[in-house]
Amino acid sequence: MIRCIRKLFTLAVVLVLLAAFGYSVVLPRVLPLQYRDIVEQYAAEYGLEEAFVYGVIFCESHFEPDVISSADAIGLMQVTEETGKWAAAQMGLDPATIDLTDPDTNIHIGCWYLSWLNEKFGGVSETVLAGYNAGHGSVARWLADEEMSWDGITLDEIPYEETKSYVKRVKLAEQAYRLRLRLQAYLEETPLGVYAD
């Protein structure tokens, strides 16, 4: 009986260690929480869910601040220079001085733009993401087309395959980050913060 209890105890310890290892080593690599303070600040400032912002960053740049796409989108949230300068002017910033490779600037402008799209498109996250990817002008045209939107608010059809795929990927990443952030909050509340990043 004592031998069985020792084996079960040993097994339990091994499982706990594996779970801790998996959380502390694997999860931060699969779903990183880089730039957390910046994401928290601007998500809160612009009424966005952190998981939503992380989903966009994950899909846009995989947390590489200096990445430039083939469409010349720059940084963590892949903001084009044109959109960045327009957004900066709308935000009361000097468009001539913005550096879209700077994580703070990029996330600030990206969150502002998501918030602007959110307001423009009635808070429908799929429509907001389509606007972020394909441009708000394209989405406005799609919403006006009865074949693509029955109510002028939601998109029943997204004609660009890239945008359709993008929306699905970001929504999936958002769900994963929602769980990751809940788990992170729970583990940060454990005694001594044993499993916190």
Segments predicted by a language model, with ranges:
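Catalytic glycan-binding domains that act on GlcNAc-containing polysaccharides
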Residues: A20-D197
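Hydrophobic membrane-insertion alpha-helices, especially the h-region
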Residues: K7-V25
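Short, Lys/Arg-rich N-terminal segment immediately upstream of the first membrane anchor
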Residues: M1-R6
